[in-house]
């Protein structure tokens, strides 16, 4: 009998699980919101610019230390049977550290400087830098495997943002890294990087390394910044990042033989958690945002897909990523905008407002739907890569019920996913099955039904809201030698299927006109006249 620990750092909270390596059974689970939350309106009573999303790294250490201690004590397992630890983290979430590996926001003279704090993945303060990087790559092949685009959420635009907005932070930072790398570096007492994070978010290639020609064309100082502050030994997924350091061995009472995996991006970890590890399997990790992932034996340039990296999920295969930056957040927004009579009716029925809205929306026939939404309330990641775009609602009349608008929000996220899927299929990477992971698909059968009919694909819903944490535990099991390959770990430890939603041919046909309208509006306001969206 052996066990592994999976540590999952999400957008607003962290989870730690202890799993049985033989079957993936979760023996103990810890979850806690980040104590300081997310700074998005103000910091120390000073207003923050729009699209700022900052966090405090101390919250991550609290989750790490308290969470691991809790699952070990709660499970009452023999601590000597714990063989490995895996970590997943939202990305690109960037942290700036001093010589002693301390976050700069701990410095008394920097605690009111927003750029000293962790820049959460959905921090969009670097859009101008991203746009400039795209401009400088014109007529070059530098971005072929990044969908010919640069996203403001990625590491390099955020570094440039700090260089332009707070150069003193850049001068005082000795290390700049993904927050996931920060955690694994602390666990192993070493300065290391994961190929998953640095490959997808830092323009690093497993054969060519960093693209310094590209960096120099953007800013002559950038190559030096990356070499001095970002370069470190890079460990691939499936390899060990090293043994757990002595300090944490003593704190938790674990063996000196416990191995630590390099961090994996949280959505990518979800692919492992659901067991979607073969070519042709399309995984949508649906949470506050949605990350779409596929594996293939080939690397081909795909326009508007946000990256492809070898060995980033399964050794030997290329992982492809795309995404939508507001899905669960969009539904939460819709709930908060619900009129009073909807809220009152939900309370009368003793139902959560979101559940009640979905109940009402489920009775709307597709042919009756006359509202189309552009779901860009947090910008657009794929396929337009423009965080300045804003959301729009079309087709409203004085008779439009609110539940029709809510249904249109759900449909818009499905239409956006279909556009992303089309990019893969147009480039000869076929999609056979869609896996829906995350907490939302389990809670919303309406969403799963809409996705199956819009995509015209079978949608497999996995019986686990802990797919990312379980994927991290699989990595821990693999590097801890419970399995000889990561594929074996994923197949043995994956969670069971909750249910399968097949597309219904009549509904598939009924959605085609709505999808066509969505595409027309998408291209009109996203490509031809984006400035109209900026004004809304």
Curated annotation (Swiss-Prot):
It catalyses: D-ribulose + ATP = D-ribulose 5-phosphate + ADP + H(+); L-ribulose + ATP = L-ribulose 5-phosphate + ADP + H(+). It comes from Staphylococcus epidermidis (strain ATCC 35984 / DSM 28319 / BCRC 17069 / CCUG 31568 / BM 3577 / RP62A). GO terms for molecular function: ATP binding; D-ribulokinase activity; ribulokinase activity. Its EC number is 2.7.1.16. GO terms for cellular component: cytoplasm. InterPro entries: ATPase_NBD (IPR043129), Carb_kinase_FGGY (IPR000577), FGGY_C (IPR018485), FGGY_N (IPR018484), Ribulokinase (IPR005929). One of its GO terms (biological process) is L-arabinose catabolic process to xylulose 5-phosphate. Belongs to the ribulokinase family. The keyword Nucleotide-binding applies. This is Ribulokinase. The keyword GTP-binding does not apply. Keywords: Arabinose catabolism, ATP-binding, Carbohydrate metabolism, Kinase, Nucleotide-binding, Transferase. Pathway: Carbohydrate degradation; L-arabinose degradation via L-ribulose; D-xylulose 5-phosphate from L-arabinose (bacterial route): step 2/3.
């Amino acid at each position: 009998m052996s066990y592994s620990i999976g540590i999952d750092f999400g957008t607003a909270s962290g989870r730690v699980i202890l799993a049985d390596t033989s079957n993936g059974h979760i023996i103990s689970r810890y979850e806690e919101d980040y104590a300081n939350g997310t700074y998005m309106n103000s910091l120390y009573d000073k207003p923050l610019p729009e699209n700022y999303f900052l966090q405090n790294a101390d919250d991550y250490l609290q989750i790490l230390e308290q969470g691991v201690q809790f699952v070990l004590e709660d499970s009452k397992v023999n601590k000597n049977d714990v063989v490995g630890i895996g970590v997943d983290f939202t990305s690109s979430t960037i942290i700036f550290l001093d010589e002693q590996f301390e976050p700069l926001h701990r410095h008394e003279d920097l605690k009111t400087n927003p750029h000293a704090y962790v820049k959460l993945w959905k921090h969009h303060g670097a859009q101008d830098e991203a746009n400039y990087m795209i401009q400088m790559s014109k007529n070059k092949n530098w971005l072929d495997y990044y969908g010919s685009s640069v996203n403001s959420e990625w590491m390099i635009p955020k570094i440039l943002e700090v260089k332009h907005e707070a150069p003193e932070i850049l001068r005082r930072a000795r290390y700049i890294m993904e927050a996931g790398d920060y955690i694994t570096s602390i666990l192993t007492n070493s300065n290391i990087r994961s190929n998953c994070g640095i490959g997808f978010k830092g323009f690093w290639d497993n054969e060519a390394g960093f693209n310094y020609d590209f960096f120099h064309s953007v800013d002559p100082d950038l190559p030096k910044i990356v070499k001095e502050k970002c370069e470190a030994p890079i460990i691939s997924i499936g390899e060990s990042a090293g043994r757990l350091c002595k300090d944490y061995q003593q704190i938790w009472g674990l063996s000196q033989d416990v191995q630590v995996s390099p961090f994996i991006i949280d959505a990518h970890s979800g692919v492992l958690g659901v067991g979607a590890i073969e070519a042709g399997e399309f995984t949508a990790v649906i949470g506050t945002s949605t990350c779409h992932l596929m594996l293939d034996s080939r690397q081909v340039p795909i326009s508007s897909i946000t990256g492809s990296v070898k060995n980033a999920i399964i050794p030997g295969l290329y992982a492809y990523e795309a995404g939508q930056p507001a899905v669960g957040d969009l539904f939460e927004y819709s709930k908060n905008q619900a009129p009073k009579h909807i809220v009152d009716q939900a309370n009368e029925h003793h139902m959560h407002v979101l559940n009640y809205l979905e109940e009402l929306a489920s009775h709307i026939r597709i042919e009756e739907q006359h509202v189309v939404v552009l779901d860009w309330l947090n910008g657009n990641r794929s396929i337009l890569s423009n965080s300045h775009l804003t959301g729009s609602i079309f087709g409203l009349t004085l008779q439009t019920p609110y539940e029709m608008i809510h249904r249109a929000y759900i449909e818009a996220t499905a239409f956006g996913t279909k556009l992303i899927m089309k990019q893969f299929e147009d480039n000869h990477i076929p999609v056979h099955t869609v896996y829906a992971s995350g907490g939302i698909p389990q809670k919303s059968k309406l969403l799963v039904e809409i996705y199956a009919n819009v995509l015209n694909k079978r949608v497999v819903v996995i019986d686990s809201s802990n797919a990312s944490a379980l994927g991290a535990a699989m990595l821990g099991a693999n590097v801890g030698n419970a399995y000889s390959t990561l594929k074996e770990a994923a197949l043995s430890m994956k969670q069971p299927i909750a249910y399968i939603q097949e597309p219904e041919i009549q509904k598939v046909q009924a959605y085609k006109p709505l999808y066509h309208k969505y595409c027309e509006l998408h291209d009109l306001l996203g490509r031809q006249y984006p400035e109209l969206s900026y004004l809304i």
